[in-house]
A protein has these predicted regions:
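Phosphate-binding glycine-rich loops of NTP-binding sites
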Residues: 46-49, 58, 118-121, 341-375, ...
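Flexible phosphate/Mg2+-sensing switch loops adjacent to catalytic phosphate-binding sites
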Residues: 75, 363-408, 742-759, 764, ...
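Conserved ABC ATPase signature
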Residues: 336-340, 344-353, 423, 876-900, ...
Length: 1010
């Protein structure tokens, strides 16, 4: 159903409402020429404007209505008359005021003009009769109405009086508009504000619109001036006033539509109005004075349409397919679509969402069809789509291409998506997710829009934001992993040293030292009783004893040498074993390094090839293990030789030599007499006693000896703290590198979101209306949760005893900003300090960290967790009015998502939204969503199914599509379309969105005026 002849709704048209006719005094040309001028005019609406007269308008209308006119005049005239029938004519009366004012430039006697624009539905005779009653020098115009010179030069009227009379006359009330020239001939700009400011303001306040083509002047009347407040403008003008302009043509040779400058020379400007070409359409600019008027060469939206014809649906046809056999009518419609905003309205079950689904299908949406509400299995596509298959949609795009599909078809996910579709069920699902975290659909949708703002070149061939971020952070994550392995190695050494720094360990060493001291004391108590060498012996006995003693001395020296050599060999054996193991470890590391280099070659091969480079010319790695292998071989050979020397089974080994030596000593001792034997036994016992005493005393290098324990205690007092500090410093520096890499990942996020951030920063609608901000930061993610779930038990004594994990770290972490490495590491140190000391007491008693750990958890694991910084995450978060996305209500999420789809999304493809207001309150729609929609429709086709008057009417939808289903007529779905100002559409709006006029009036009567 087409409402009159403008089903596409409000579109941009050229209007010239200041065109004089031969009825104006001084006009150059006759009516035949005038009709030719009108018919060939480059404009759609023409206001025939004469001084205190509509005679010219009436004559042209007569000619259009006269059938005989089709045969009159020449061919040019007849052709122009036919063209003129497609245009709209408005009756306009130009009046002069009685007021004579002092010009602000010092000129006196200035006359002020104003225009009365009448509804063409009014009979011209009624307008003429009203004009003839105007008084001139005490008598009405009457019979002098045909005297154009008299009307031009002699008639002046009181502005307030004539407006008052028209408003009081039921025939004219709401059927005329007052147009007041401003900065043009007869305009009020010349009024001196020093003497007649009040008059000037009153004239402006009483005018419906002003005459000016100056953008600065137009902006002023739209209250767009930084010097003045909205309150000041409201006091001056009452409401915002539209500015329009006409050609002020007085000559049939003028080009109508084209505006003139102050020297009456033609310019490249036209007066464009986006409305039905009717009086009601003109009235609409009073309610939308900014968005429905453009004075210039061409409105930006028309340029947008020309440049993006592939991204606009021009028309949609839904018809029965050729093989259809269903008796039901369902669809038989042809819907021209507006390029701006289309609002689809209708009662429940009327076919609103059906049209949205069909549009989405025709545009190959990539939205999951399961979210459709009409083209689904349990509705129109039931029984394997048998019914849907009998109907087809044909979409005509503005570039001339067409898309035809059966309604049982499914969108092709591999094809080009030509429309963005947001069904009601999908929007509701995304907005009501219970855990809208980083992996939620809500976040995923936002990331898609953000990715659209990254230039094709900067996407590096990646298809999603996550892919691009992963690519750009891969090496940084590798650096973090390597650093964490290094941290773990340092922690292994550090925990070993810290275990020695405890009071328990010191006490254990002190106890071992005391035990050795007692052992040495006890050993001294059992020293051999001294036996003197026999002195009263004969010369022969003495000679025999001396010979045996000499041999015994030699054997004992041999025994001492064997013992000393055995000790040396065992030390060397131990050293060689350690060196062999070290060589093997180094060889393993070299092999690992070689494997890493090989992996680097594999991973960079394709990239280097694209750059025309070779890895070998950038990095040269030469691995030669020959010296290491030779060294390990020599060490192994030496150890094998020493193993043989120390092996008791070999005849020439040291143990075998010692056994033989002891046998010889025993044999020599058997040759001595009793006194000398006792003396030798004493010497042997004394040697063994001294040997054991030396073993007990030991040396600082021997750990389990008296001097070894003394050295360990000395190390605990002096050397150990320095070694611990050294490892802690080393660990801190590595942790700083980890933090540096995390910060670098954060900066990658920042670069990814820079384009969106710039858009948000530059958008007044987003910045002020939504208070939408991006924040780049490093955040602590679930530190307390992991710390107390995996590592620390709050059920034992200590600083965290009986504390809830959610609050346990609050008093510690609040003072630290983890965005800096120093403060992040200070935070960790404070946590460790709370584990090392019981902060619940004034004494802050020392505590063992190990005693506070969960079962099967060691201190090293805790250190790896704390110093690995795995709980620090780079985040580039979006916040709405200071709130993180995870804390937004479903309504706030819906608003934000729609803002992203509408305003932030760079795509110019049509966007179809099914009932976005379902999760939004009316105030949110009015304050936040409407400014966004009005801004976006300037550059993108928006199609919305809605039952909200705020969206359809306050957003000033250019086209309203009313859906209705006639069940009695075979389920015929009927779509009626047109502009808001269309009378039929206006009635639908009131009935459907407001619940009928009486319901609306009832509500309005009960509201208090603010």
């Amino acid at each position: 159903v087409l409402d009159k002849s403008w089903p596409r709704g409000a579109v941009w048209r050229k209007w010239d409402i200041h065109v004089h006719s031969p009825a104006s005094d001084g006009f150059r040309g006759d009516y035949n020429q005038f009709v030719i001028q009108l018919g060939n005019a480059d404009c759609d609406v023409i206001g025939i404007n004469d001084y205190f007269s509509v005679a010219g308008y009436r004559e042209v209308v007569r000619r259009l209505a006269d059938p005989a006119g089709d045969t009159e005049g020449n061919a040019a005239y007849r052709d122009a008359l036919e063209k003129l029938r497609s245009k709209v004519l408005l009756p306009v009366v130009e009046c002069r005021m009685t007021n004579v004012l002092m010009n602000k430039h010092g000129k006196s006697g200035q006359r002020l003009n104003f225009h009365l624009i009448f509804d063409p539905e009014l009979p011209a005779e009624d307008i003429e009769n009203f004009l003839k009653t105007q008084q001139v020098d005490g008598s009405s115009i009457g019979g002098r109405y045909a005297d154009s010179a008299f009307l031009l030069n002699s008639v002046q009227v009181d502005f307030n009086e004539i407006v008052k009379r028209l408003k009081a006359d039921g025939n004219f009330r709401d059927r005329f508009l007052v147009w007041l020239p401003y900065d043009e001939y007869g305009g009020i700009d010349g009024i001196d504000p020093k003497t007649d400011q009040l008059l000037k303001l009153n004239l402006i306040r009483d005018a419906d619109m002003l005459g000016s083509s100056n953008k600065n002047q137009a902006d002023f009347f739209l209250w767009k001036h930084p010097t003045y407040t909205e309150q000041q403008f409201r006091e001056w003008f009452g409401v915002r006033k539209p500015c329009v302009k006409g050609s002020d043509s007085h000559n049939v040779n003028d080009e109508l539509g084209r505006l003139k400058d102050h020297k009456s020379l033609p310019t490249d400007k036209y007066c464009w109005i986006k409305a039905d070409p009717t009086f009601a359409g003109l009235r609409q600019i009073l309610h939308e004075p900014e968005d429905r008027i453009f004075i210039g060469a061409c409105p930006p939206k028309l340029e947008e349409v020309r440049n993006n014809a592939t991204r606009l649906i021009d028309r949609l046809q839904i018809t029965r397919s050729g093989d259809a056999d269903t008796p039901d009518k369902w669809f038989a419609c042809d819907i021209p679509l507006n390029a701006d905003m289309v609002a689809i309205i209708g009662n429940k079950g009327s076919g609103k969402s059906a049209l949205a689904d069909i549009l989405a299908l025709a545009g190959n949406t990539h939205c999951d069809p399961d979210h459709f509400s009409f083209l689904v299995k349990n509705r129109f596509c039931e029984r394997s789509g048998k019914l849907a298959k009998q109907f087809e949609v044909r979409a005509f795009w503005a570039d001339g291409t067409e898309t035809t599909l059966r309604l049982n078809a499914k969108p092709d996910p591999n094809g080009v998506e030509r429309v963005r579709y947001i069904p009601q069920t999908y929007l509701e699902k995304v907005c009501t997710e219970t855990e809208p975290g980083q992996q939620s659909e809500f976040q995923a949708e936002l990331r898609k829009v953000i990715f659209s703002h990254i230039s094709e070149a900067d996407r590096l061939g990646k298809h999603t934001l996550d892919e691009l971020i992963e690519y750009k952070t891969e090496e940084l994550k590798g650096q973090i992993a390597n650093a964490r392995r290094e941290i773990s190695r340092v922690n292994t050494d550090l925990v070993r040293l810290e275990d020695k720094f405890t009071p328990d360990y010191r006490a254990r060493i002190e106890a071992l030292l005391a035990e050795k001291q007692q052992e040495l004391k006890a050993h001294k108590d059992i020293a051999p009783i001294k036996v003197e060498q026999p002195s009263e012996v004969g010369a022969e006995q003495k000679a025999a004893f001396d010979a045996i003693a000499l041999k015994l001395g030699e054997e004992r020296a041999t025994l001492n040498r064997i013992d000393s050599e055995t000790i040396d060999k065992r030390e060397l054996q131990k050293s060689l074993a350690e060196k062999i193991a070290l060589a093997g470890k180094i060889e393993g590391k070299i092999d690992t390094f070689g494997s890493e280099y090989a992996r680097l070659g594999r991973e960079t091969s394709d990239d280097l090839q694209r750059l025309g480079l070779e890895l070998g010319k950038l990095v040269t790695v030469t691995i030669d293990k020959s010296m290491l292998v030779a060294a390990r071989k020599k060490l192994t050979e030496d150890k094998t030789a020493i193993d043989g020397v120390l092996d008791g089974g070999a005849p020439d080994s040291l143990p075998s030599q010692k056994a033989a030596c002891l046998e010889r000593i025993t044999a020599l001792q058997g040759q001595l007499d009793a006194p000398n034997k006792r003396f030798q036994e004493y010497n042997e016992a004394l040697r063994a006693w001294n040997e054991k005493a030396a073993l007990i005393e030991g040396s600082p290098e021997k750990g389990d000896t008296l001097k070894g324990y003394e050295a360990q205690l000395a190390y605990l007092r002096t050397g150990l703290p320095a070694d611990i500090d050294k490892l802690r410093l080393q660990r801190r520096e590595i942790a700083k590198e980890i933090h540096k890499s995390i910060a670098a990942i954060r900066d990658v996020y920042k670069a990814m979101f820079a384009a969106v951030q710039e858009l948000i920063s530059s958008s007044v609608v987003i910045k002020e209306g939504f208070k939408l901000t991006f924040e780049s930061s490093i955040i602590v993610r679930n530190l307390a949760g992991e710390l107390f779930d995996k590592y620390i038990s709050a059920n034992v004594g200590g600083s965290f005893y009986r504390k809830e994990k959610g609050t346990a770290l609050d008093e510690i972490g609040g003072e630290f900003d983890v965005n800096t490495a120093e403060e992040a590491l200070s935070y960790i140190n404070k946590i460790v300090s709370h584990l090392e000391h019981d902060m619940r007491t004034a004494q802050q008693s020392p505590m063992s960290i190990a005693s506070q750990l969960r079962k099967n958890v060691d201190v090293k694991a805790l250190y790896d967790f704390l110093w690995g910084l795995g709980y620090l995450e780079p985040e580039y978060s979006l916040k709405l009015d200071g709130k993180d996305l995870s804390h937004l209500s479903p309504g706030e999420r819906g608003t934000l998502l729609l803002v992203f789809y509408l305003l932030v999304d760079k795509s110019h493809k049509p966007i179809i939204v099914d009932q976005p207001e379902e999760n939004l309150d009316s105030q949110t729609v009015y304050k936040l969503l409407i400014p966004v929609i009005k801004d976006v429709k300037k550059r993108r086709q928006i199609i919305m199914v809605t039952h909200s008057p705020n969206i359809a009417v306050v957003c000033d939808a250019e086209q309203i599509v009313h859906a209705h289903i006639d069940r009695a007529a075979g389920n015929a779905v009927i779509y009626t379309m047109g502009a808001i100002e269309s009378p039929a559409i206006n009635r639908y709006l009131v009935d459907v969105l407001e619940g009928t006029r009486p319901a609306f009036d009832n509500r309005e009567a009960k509201y208090f005026a603010s």
